[in-house]
Amino acid sequence: MAAASLAVFCRRVSAALKASTSLISSQTLASTGCRFSLSLLTKNTPNVTSFHQCRLLQTTLSRRGLEEFFDDPKNWGEEKVKSGASWTCQQLRNKSNEDLHKLWYVLLKERNMLLTLEQEAKRQRLPMPSPERLEKVVDSMDALDKVVQEREDALRLLQTGQEKPRPGAWRRDIFGRIIWHKFKQWPIPWYLNKRYNRKRFFAMPYVERFVRLRIEKQARIKARKISLTQKKEKFLQKKFPHLSEAQKSSAA
């Protein structure tokens, strides 16, 4: 029922777009009156050397790519749509920058289409067919962004030797925390800059006690998480002993 209603909506939109395109094209042809033959052109215009040098009137489609915001008509009315696996970082590292640039726009168009489909399904209060497609596209775009960032970092390290895109240094603030301080250009020297001098890149001696307490708290939280995961693993092994035995045999 959900897929059928979405299919009806998409068919109506496509029919409206086709009707508007045919109407505008007929109006432009009737108004311009560009129907003439090659023989008349050669007789009336002796200075023109060839017909290929003449540029006819061109009009863009009224749809302007709106059909790309909707799914393929073959998938209309289907409850499940087959889709491939998402792109991994290892696969994207083997591609050139030009291929990654093209793939980014392909994924962006696919994401816009799926978001349109998701919004229409929410409007009709119906389930979206194969919602995992949107998750795969998002994962692929995240992996592509990560690969591009890796290449930018490698190029920056080769040219300037800096790890961060913006130069800076590790400093200690007044609370005893180690932070990354980003450098910034100022029109006046640092010793005349009151705003910069208000920053304190040191900690008082009485802060060391609280730094130890913060480290102990972080260590307790980490140990609590590790013990919780171990308890979950033991519980699952007791509840599903056949799975644990199969895992041990596959590892051996």
Curated annotation (Swiss-Prot):
Residue numbers carrying N6-acetyllysine: 146
Molecular-function GO terms, alphabetical: structural constituent of ribosome
One GO term of the biological process aspect: mitochondrial translation
Keywords associated with the record: Acetylation, Mitochondrion, Ribonucleoprotein, Ribosomal protein, Transit peptide
Chief location: mitochondrion
Any one of the GO CC terms: mitochondrial large ribosomal subunit
Pfam families: MRP-L47 (PF06984)
Subcellular compartments: Mitochondrion
Subunit structure: Component of the mitochondrial ribosome large subunit (39S) which comprises a 16S rRNA and about 50 distinct proteins.
Protein family membership: Belongs to the universal ribosomal protein uL29 family.
PANTHER family linked: LARGE RIBOSOMAL SUBUNIT PROTEIN UL29M (PTHR21183:SF18), RIBOSOMAL PROTEIN L47, MITOCHONDRIAL-RELATED (PTHR21183)
Protein name: Large ribosomal subunit protein uL29m
High-level lineage: Eukaryota, Metazoa, Chordata, Craniata, Vertebrata
